[in-house]
UniProtKB/Swiss-Prot annotation:
Residues 252-341, 768-790 are annotated as: Disordered. ATP binds at G509, S510, G511, K512, S513, V514. Its main location: membrane. It is a multi-pass membrane protein. Residues 247-854 are cytoplasmic. The lineage of its organism: Bacteria, Pseudomonadati, Pseudomonadota, Alphaproteobacteria, Hyphomicrobiales. Residues 489-708 form the FtsK domain. It comes from Brucella suis biovar 1 (strain 1330). This is DNA translocase FtsK. It comes from the Bacteria.
Amino acid sequence: MRQGYSPSYPLRDERITEDRLRFANLVRRQVYILLGLGLLSLTAMAVGALATWNVADPSFSHATDNPVTNALGYPGAVFSDLAMQFFGLASVPALLPLAVWSLLLMIRGYIGRIARRSLAWVGAALLFAAIASCLAVPQSWPMPIGLGGVFGDMLLRIPGFFLGGFPQGAIASAIALVLAFPALWFCFFASGIIGRGAEAVNPAMLSANRSADDEFADEDADNEAGGGFHFIGALTHLVLMTTATIRRMTGLGRRRSREDDFDDMRMVRRSAETRNAPRREPGFGAPAADDEPPFDMDDMDDGAPLAGQEWHDAPPPRARKARVEQAAPSPKPGPRAQREAQPSFLKDNGIFEMPSLHFLAEPKLVQRDPALSKDALEQNARLLEGVLEDFGVRGEIINVKPGPVVTLYELEPAPGIKSSRVIGLADDIARSMSAIAARVAVIPGRNAIGIELPNPKREMVYLREMLASRDFEQSKAKLALALGKTINGEPVIADIAKMPHVLVAGTTGSGKSVAINTMILSLLYRMTPQECRLIMIDPKMLELSVYDGIPHLLTPVVTDPKKAVVALKWTVREMEDRYRKMSKVGVRNIDGFNQRVGLAQKKGEPIARTVQTGFDRNTGEAIYETEELDLEPMPYIVVIIDEMADLMMVAGKDIEGAVQRLAQMARAAGIHVIMATQRPSVDVITGTIKANFPTRISFQVTSKIDSRTILGEQGAEQLLGQGDMLFMAGGGRIQRVHGPFVGDDEVERIVQHLKLQGVPEYLDAITEDEDDDEGGSGPAGTGNLEDSDDPYDQAVAVVLRDKKASTSYIQRRLGIGYNRAASIIERMEDEGIVGPANHAGKREILVPTGDDDF
């Protein structure tokens, strides 16, 4: 093992980011100062209106032609009249929190716990009104109510109910004294003078450099919420804050002494020397700087001057390849998130309104785990190398990539070390590193093996962060799906139009249902009902039923397994019909078809084609006619099957046949399938399904066998659950992704919004089980005859039409079992429709096959 290694990190990007944060903080502070000045101006105007209040001025409660004497004119007269009517003399102290809030905005740049302080403000105003009503009303009071206004008199009726009358005299004074303490506490709490010890720090100030303006906020943060007893100290502190602000704004400050200047210069020089000095790395062979022996006077030699001693740095350690990469920053917000951050009051009527990002939970600001610091990750890398050496695996960690859930350690094994040997040590590595699980896999295209260890503290990935990212907004994918984040924290956006189908598997509680919801919401946030339609099949009747009624659905959520078979067969017929339309237009996929139809509609010209209708009897030349095609743009269709295992148990053969045809041919027709199951066994995920679903997602499974069934290799059993997945794209490359979380309440809000945009246009033919007149072409092209009451009549029709009667032929044509087909043939023989089998196994049809139906 190499010692004394320290990775070098680029500082240019950090300096640029720091400058941007400083500039953003400067602009933000100026905005807050303007807001504070505006609020202070409004407070001063309110005080002026109350100071010049005259009961004879015209207002809402007093209609008169007298001239307005209020200093603020008619608006001031109306405001002062309403304030005195409702709060009385309590209107004046009720303005104190507004004045303090304006100062806080100018000084600190934010007001913490604004909701609680607003409630405290209302409570203080009401209590002050009650206290004012306790005072005796003088003869000069022009109002017919008490000094506390309407609210004050109403509050005093509560103790009056128990006392038998309105409080007066000593009782009123006692009530005023009792209410004084909570009124003052509410007033000081609402003003922000007390109760700042536990309030949240403004997130915008965390990343900015500390300035002189922030010193007051830091000093105030030392106060506790229980400081309500020290009113005098709080008032003194407010006066000092105001004085310091005025001095700083006017440029008047105390003169600094020479010693203070000297100390500041010394600190600046020391910090500059520390920043520019080369970093010294501790080595295992030399004591670290913190392990130096204590100073001893006996070790000093008076004969040798201290200044003459020369200190030499330790020899530079040997360079290593290992380095700790910075975690990927949060996804940059896209144009849509920026537009929704500034709400508009103008809405377009008659246009489908896409769901807003505000329906989703906002990501919480979390501090970076100290266990993911560069030093801690470097130490874990050295420890992991030691663990591998204990098991006889030589190599070195060349890269460390921390992420929101796991950290990837890239191991470059020594020559002669087999990858299978390292992969087999996954459980031992997890035990030695005290981890819940460890996943070991070869990194494609590199001479490295990835070792993924879970972080001590897991970060949650939010769907709003994914949908608001610039990667999702500017993605060129036709049907973009926000799958989650990689190990590095980079967003993963997949296009189901290129997959073209996806198989999802995972046990209960692994996050499979949440992933299905995120896929659906990804489509709903980008596609209108004219662009994408959905067919949802949910045999469990719980997961997808919440989407029932949205305009994107082609049919209500199918919960009956028998109806699910019919819906899949309708999808197959729709696929074949789309291919016939595209063949007539002469295009190869749905995008070309929609482009051709849209261009024709824009020009106002019908789509026509030339077809041959026959030959001229005289000349023998071909006759051509022009056929006009009445076509409309076709939307994408996404079929979502939440539980495949239940469908396979009810009608496995029909389901497998329909899914096979869709998976093989439906891509160009714009039909895509998302199939999920929680039982990834070979009888559910058959070889036919696996061959036609190259894109697969595996969540946590219980065994290595299930992992091999889904992905073809182990590793899914080592996942952490709760959205932790392995994403295998079409090329077979497996990528670990952490899926985003979306709650049920968020889904309900989005569904309610979509229901307000319009009603769905259902197609009844999707779930109608109509008999196939042609007998079908196999399990995917016929009705579910095995579930019919009597398929005997259909079998007779097939025999009379095709003039073939055998057990295997009936079995193939009707898609039924061999035993049932044999019973039908025996019944036909008993009724005289067919004869007995000859030596070759063929039967003669005894019933005449004329024009008359049987």
